[in-house]
Structures are given as C-alpha cells and as structure tokens.
C-alpha cells in the first residue's frame, strides 16, 4: 500500500464498486464490457498455499478480459541452484504484463520488486497482506454504505501481516484504527 497514493487507492475501490454493479447481470466467467485487460497476462507465483487468493485473482483477470499463468516456485529453477531472482524476474517480465507473488519471504518480495520491469502485486508476504485489506475496506464500505474514513475500525487479534497492512491503510484512507493484541501474540 505504501507505493500507491491515497488518491489511486480510492480509485481502485471506486472502480471495484462500479465493476461489481455493472456485473450484476453477467455470469462469473463473462468478460466485462470493453475487456480492459484484453491481451494482458498476469503471472501468479504461489509459494504458500492459497484458495481464495488464487481463485479471486484468476476470476478477476478473466472477467477483465485477460489471462493468468500460475506458477509454483518449485516448478522453476529459482532457488534450486539454477536461476537467481534477477534472472527469473527478467524472464517473467518478458512473458507477462504483471506479476503477483504470494510468498513467505519479505526479501524475495523486495528482490522481485527491484528486478521486475512489470508491476508487482503483493498477494501475501510475512509483513503485509494488502490485497486482503483492500477487499476488507471494499466490504466494510459496501455494508456500512459510507467511506471508511467516516468509521472507527477496531482490530482484536494477533499482530500479523494483515494488521500491518490495516495500519498502512488507516493512514492512506484516513480512518481511525484501534488495536488490541494479547501480549503473547504481539
């Protein structure tokens, strides 16, 4: 979230609301009018298991007219004495228009960000889970029927990657956030 302006984050939420409204009469696999991602490929790499993230990204890209290529790190030479992240990032940049990484390594996320020449989306890392928080903001605004900036949000639970992203989002979206974390879960 730190790399995207508050204005652009708000545009993402507004666009998602508009697209959801326009999709009410479309089936799950029908493509949005205008196919904004026609001819575009999102490469997804999962180092951690995923159900919702994988399916959500696949369907979102499909509904926008694009395609996905899903990889597991164990299917690549990456980290197995073969290619470096630098080389892998260069290769992936030639085949895709965007890259989504779900990883258990913050360093790997930063290295891919450094060496890719295409946009990267953090699908989950040890320190952040921005896509989860954006979908949470979308849902809260949809249910409460007002911008999150007009709400007080409370987090009770362990201190984790979702909380880190929620803290960042509270600054970007200007909402009040109260946090309660048990001592053994700091």
Show where each model-derived region lies.
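Anion-binding alpha/beta catalytic cores of soluble intermediary-metabolism enzymes, centered on
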Residues: 26, 89-90, 96-169
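Positively charged, low-complexity intrinsically disordered leader regions
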Residues: 1-55
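Hydrophobic beta-strand scaffold residues
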Residues: 68-70, 99, 120, 177
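Conserved active-site and cofactor/substrate-binding residues in soluble primary-metabolism enzymes
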Residues: 4-7, 37, 48, 52, ...
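Short, surface-exposed connector motifs at secondary-structure boundaries
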Residues: 38-41, 91-97, 149, 174-177
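Active-site cofactor/substrate anionic-group-binding motifs, chiefly glycine-
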Residues: 41-95
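Glycine-rich phosphate/diphosphate-binding loop of Rossmann-like nucleotide-binding domains
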Residues: 47-60, 142-186
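Short, acidic/turn-prone active-site loops that include or flank metal/cofactor-
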Residues: 74-76, 124-128, 182-185
């Amino acid at each position: 979230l730190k790399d995207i302006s508050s204005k652009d984050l708000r545009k993402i939420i507004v666009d998602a609301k508009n697209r959801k409204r326009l999709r009410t009469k479309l089936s799950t696999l029908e493509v949005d009018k205008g196919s904004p991602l026609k001819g575009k490929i999102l490469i997804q790499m999962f180092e951690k298991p995923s159900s919702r993230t994988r399916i959500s990204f696949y369907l979102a890209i499909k509904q926008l007219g694009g395609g996905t290529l899903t990889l597991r790190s164990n299917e690549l030479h990456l980290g197995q004495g073969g290619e470096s992240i630098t080389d892998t990032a260069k290769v992936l940049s030639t085949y895709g228009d965007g890259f989504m990484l779900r990883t258990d390594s913050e360093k790997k996320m930063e290295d891919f960000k450094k060496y890719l020449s295409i946009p990267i989306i953090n699908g989950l890392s040890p320190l952040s889970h921005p896509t989860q928080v954006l979908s949470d903001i979308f849902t809260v605004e949809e249910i409460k029927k007002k911008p999150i900036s007009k709400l007080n949000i409370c987090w009770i639970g362990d201190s984790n990657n979702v909380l880190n992203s929620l803290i960042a989002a509270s600054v970007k979206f200007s909402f009040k956030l109260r946090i309660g974390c048990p001592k053994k879960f700091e």
